[in-house]
Structures are given as structure tokens and as C-alpha cells.
């Protein structure tokens, strides 16, 4: 059996409500099963004219410069779709997010659909999906003695924030 490629991705959006948000940036990295980076894509666009960005989203993602982008939303979505298709057509791929199934994944699907692209790229044609945060919940519950999960603000609660997990394991988290 062929080992699947891994496609890690994250989006930045104009809002916090999936029904009123637009993707303004998407970063994707293609790796082999041993996590060797084979290709990457980082693309953004300006907000659509009728989308009003939510201040909380703009404070979180700090993508104010996207307002000056000459890339249209359609062009960005088409390039994401084309890239993901090219990465996953000849070899099955697993699309990996961190806390992305409820928001990023659904928003990607909706925006593929709005722009007349097949919305289910991430789970058809032998492709699959993985939300690492859901996996971290299982690890924290059942394998807490095998993998260090940091505490939240030195309290009894655990922190599953990606930056906290990376910090405790000596991994760098690059924000673009």
C-alpha cells in the first residue's frame, strides 16, 4: 500500500462566524509520510466587497495588509483548489489541520462550492482528513504519561493550544 502524503493547512479569515466569514489567506505544506517537505503554498486575497471583517478576527490574524491585495478571492480559491488537486490526484493524501474541522474545513468547502469547484477534495478519491487537536484530546486522556501536555496558566487545566504544545516540546511555530 502506498503511504499517503500529508497536506498541512491553516486559514486566516475575516470573521469568527462561519456563516459570515471569508478566507483571506491559506497556507499549505505538502510532506511525505516521513514529514519531509515537498512543496508549499501561501496565498491570500483581498476581502470581497460585501464582507465586513470582524474586529476580533483582524486582531487575531493581523492580516490588515490583505486589504491591499491585488489577488481576487476567486483567484485565491482556484489556486488553492488546483494545488490541492495536483498534490492529491496521483497519490492519496491526508489533509491535516489543528482545530480546523469545524471551521477551516467547512469554510474551505463552502468557498470551493461558491466558486464552482468540487467541495470535497479533502475526503474523496482516497483522501482523508485529520484534526490534530482531536487527536491531542485523546492523547491527553489516554496517553498522558507518554506525551507532555502543558498546563494552562499553571493551573490544573491542560492547554491544548498549539503554541503551548510546541513550546513544551521545543518546536518552533512560525507565524506568517
Language model region names:
Residues 103-127:
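Substrate-recognition/cap helix-loop segment adjacent to the acidic, metal-dependent catalytic center
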Residues 174-176:
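Conserved small/polar residues in nucleotide/adenosyl-binding loops
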Residues 129-153:
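Short alpha-helix plus adjacent loop in nuclease-associated cores
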Residues 2-111, 164-167:
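Conserved non-catalytic scaffold segment of RNase H-like nuclease domains
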Residues 99-104, 128, 132, 158:
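Short, conserved alpha-helical segments within structured domains
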Residues 153-170:
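A structural motif
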Residues 89-91, 115-123, 145-152:
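Short helix-coil transition/hinge motifs at the ends and kinks of transmembrane helices
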Residues 63-64, 118, 170-172:
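Short coil/loop linkers at secondary-structure junctions
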Amino acid at each position: 500500500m502506498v503511504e499517503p502524503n500529508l497536506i498541512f493547512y491553516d486559514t486566516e479569515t475575516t470573521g469568527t462566524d462561519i456563516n459570515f466569514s471569508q478566507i483571506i489567506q491559506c497556507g499549505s505544506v505538502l510532506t511525505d509520510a516521513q514529514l519531509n517537505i515537498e512543496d508549499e503554498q501561501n496565498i491570500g486575497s483581498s476581502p470581497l466587497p460585501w464582507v465586513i471583517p470582524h474586529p476580533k478576527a483582524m486582531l487575531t490574524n493581523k492580516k490588515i495588509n490583505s486589504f491591499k491585495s491585488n489577488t481576487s478571492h476567486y483567484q485565491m480559491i482556484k489556486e488553492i483548489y488546483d494545488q490541492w488537486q495536483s498534490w492529491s490526484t496521483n497519490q492519496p493524501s491526508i489533509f491535516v489541520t489543528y482545530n480546523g474541522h469545524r471551521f477551516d474545513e467547512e469554510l474551505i468547502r463552502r468557498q470551493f462550492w461558491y466558486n464552482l469547484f468540487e467541495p470535497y477534495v479533502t475526503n474523496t478519491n482516497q483522501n482523508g482528513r485529520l484534526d490534530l487537536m482531536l487527536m491531542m484530546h485523546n492523547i491527553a486522556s489516554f496517553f498522558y504519561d507518554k506525551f507532555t501536555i502543558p498546563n494552562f496558566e499553571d493551573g490544573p487545566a491542560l492547554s491544548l493550544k498549539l503554541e503551548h504544545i510546541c513550546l513544551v516540546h521545543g518546536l518552533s511555530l512560525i507565524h506568517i
